[in-house]
């Protein structure tokens, strides 16, 4: 109970608030108990789907967050949720519609409330560009983990050793991604192919820019550390995590239209899920779960590569979000089981690593 209160208390409170808002909105918009119950049910289902399909997001977040100080960890949970809720679940789809329809923000809000079907059509119509941008960014996040010459722990041994080995080639992962994007673009009609490639390149550039900012901030922190000054900055990691969360959210926001085309209902449901993902991240960091299970990170990053690949392919093929989530869950489950098996077979090595940390 203490663990639940400590790590998930804020998320549970946030859930109560969102359900309260859903209750109020349901009664005011439908005027019936049945209509309100339907809205609340959709909110709950959306939140559960968001949580169940985002465990890989939480694991990857934890791998970054564990190196940030406590203050920035808290900011990720508080400030970051504002970006996740208002930025990705509300402003992002509204911005897509505003750009696609050439209308202003207020007109877009009115459209989402008065003509949800047209609002859904406009958001879904932007899927090719979203798939290119989000897929490229996520693919780079996953590839960067494995294209690392200093990586000495391997889960899928032969593949990971090979990727670690060829990382000596400059920008090998970028070349691989560009080739994949070019191949997928050949399957698309010409206008969509151009949109897809431009969006994918922008996703790649965004990843490089965020990595660059993080590196510059780390160098500045190192200078301060050498000078004996206190180092408290976690801005680079904070920016990286929020862009990563945005990339994870693209498919979820669009896929939510399968259950509802009401902007308010979608925002409430996905926001609850986003809050719990952040709480799961903090829980993983505080409990040191990544250190206890040596292959868990590997499973999460493989899941991200798969998610990025599926997102890129979704520009041409419809792939259910359920399938995507199941693949991620299977990879993480296998990596967890492999980690437990390793710990049982090599207890002395595990103890030595724990003492070394």
Where are these regions (language model features)?
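Multi-pass alpha-helical transmembrane bundle typical of ion/small-solute transporters
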Residues: 1-357
């Amino acid at each position: 109970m203490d663990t639940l209160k400590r790590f998930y208390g804020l998320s549970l409170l946030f859930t109560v608030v969102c359900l309260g808002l859903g209750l109020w909105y349901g009664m005011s918009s439908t005027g019936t108990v049945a209509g309100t119950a339907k809205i609340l049910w959709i909110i709950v289902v959306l939140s559960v789907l968001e949580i169940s399909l985002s465990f890989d997001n939480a694991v990857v977040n934890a791998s970054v967050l564990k190196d940030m100080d406590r203050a920035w960890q808290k900011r990720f949970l508080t400030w970051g949720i504002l970006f996740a809720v208002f930025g990705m679940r509300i402003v992002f789809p509204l911005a897509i519609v505003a750009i696609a329809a050439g209308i202003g923000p207020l007109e877009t809000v009115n459209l989402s409330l008065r003509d949800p079907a047209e609002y859904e059509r406009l958001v879904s119509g932007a899927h090719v560009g979203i798939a290119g941008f989000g897929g490229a960014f996520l693919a780079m996040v996953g590839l960067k983990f494995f294209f690392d010459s200093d990586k000495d722990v391997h889960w899928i041994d032969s593949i990971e050793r090979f990727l670690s080995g060829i990382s000596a080639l400059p920008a090998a992962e970028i070349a691989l991604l560009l080739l994949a994007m070019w191949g997928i673009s050949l399957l698309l009609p010409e206008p969509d192919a151009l949109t897809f490639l431009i969006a994918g390149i922008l996703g790649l550039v965004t990843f490089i820019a965020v990595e660059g900012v993080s590196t510059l901030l780390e160098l500045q922190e190192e200078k301060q550390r050498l000078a004996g000054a206190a180092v408290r900055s976690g801005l680079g990691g904070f920016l990286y995590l929020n862009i990563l969360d945005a990339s994870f959210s693209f498919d979820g926001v669009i896929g939510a239209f399968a259950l509802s085309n009401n902007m308010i209902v979608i925002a409430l449901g996905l926001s609850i899920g986003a809050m719990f993902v952040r709480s799961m991240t903090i829980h993983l960091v505080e409990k040191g779960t990544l250190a206890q299970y040596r292959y868990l990170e590997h499973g999460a990053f493989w899941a991200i590569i798969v998610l990025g690949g599926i997102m890129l392919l979704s520009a041409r093929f419809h792939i259910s979000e359920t399938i995507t989530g199941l693949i991620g869950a299977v990879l993480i489950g296998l990596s967890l089981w492999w980690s437990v098996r390793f710990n049982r077979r090599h207890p002395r090595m595990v103890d030595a690593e724990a003492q070394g940390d």
